[in-house]
Amino acid sequence: MSGGAGPDGGRILTTSPGEIAEQKAILRGHMREIRAEAAARDPDAAIRLAARFPARLFERYGPVVAGTVAIRDELDAAPLLARLEGLGARIVLPRIETDGAMTFRDPAGAPLEKGPLGLAQPSGEAEIVRPNLVLAPLLAFDLRGRRLGYGKGYYDQAIARLRATGRVFYLGLAYAQQQVDAVPIAPHDLLLDWVETPRGSIPLFLGRAVGR
């Protein structure tokens, strides 16, 4: 049995897969409210994040960057993607395939389709491209690099496949308010290398990506 502090200061006990799933569900509900409040209070957050994003990360881990199209109150990656494209990045976007796997495809200016969870994604005819740098939305993160998503495992599975064939830098985009003491984690959950917020950069075990 192991544990850590939750967002309310309580203990997070990780004793079984069922309990971990329950803890994640509770935390998701709480963090949806936190993120919605942060987004409402700071409508210019995405612009500030893009302006202060460290170009050295792209220079080291580019040139192919997997972005995302924001849904609901996610931190909008569009201003950052525009800046990176200006620096020479090739931008690809995630697509959820019919088998549930996430691939990354070059939209090449074509209209996006509606995918699972309301995600705007490239068509199945778009070229699949392997990214070097993956930007991921999230609900919560901690300083160990743990990420709380929506529970489908799309990013964990995609990053695992990418890391099996070479280096990839896994970067979360978040409001600073989305940081918690400890995110419940299951064996298949992968750790972030970095989190970028409108307030600053948070390196997380950078050496994991450097070694790949």
Predicted regions span which residues?
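Short linear sequence motifs
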Residues: 97, 147-148
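Glycine-rich, N-terminal phosphate-binding loop of Rossmann-like dinucleotide-binding domains
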Residues: 69, 138, 199
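Short glycine-rich anion-binding loops that position phosphate/pyrophosphate groups of nucleotides
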Residues: 71-73, 139-143
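A structured binding-face within diverse protein domains that lines the active/interaction site
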Residues: 121, 137-140
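Surface-exposed, charge/polar-rich loops and edge strands
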Residues: 2-22, 26, 33-40, 125-134, ...
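N-terminal active-site beta-alpha-beta segment that forms phosphate/nucleotide-binding
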Residues: 2-130
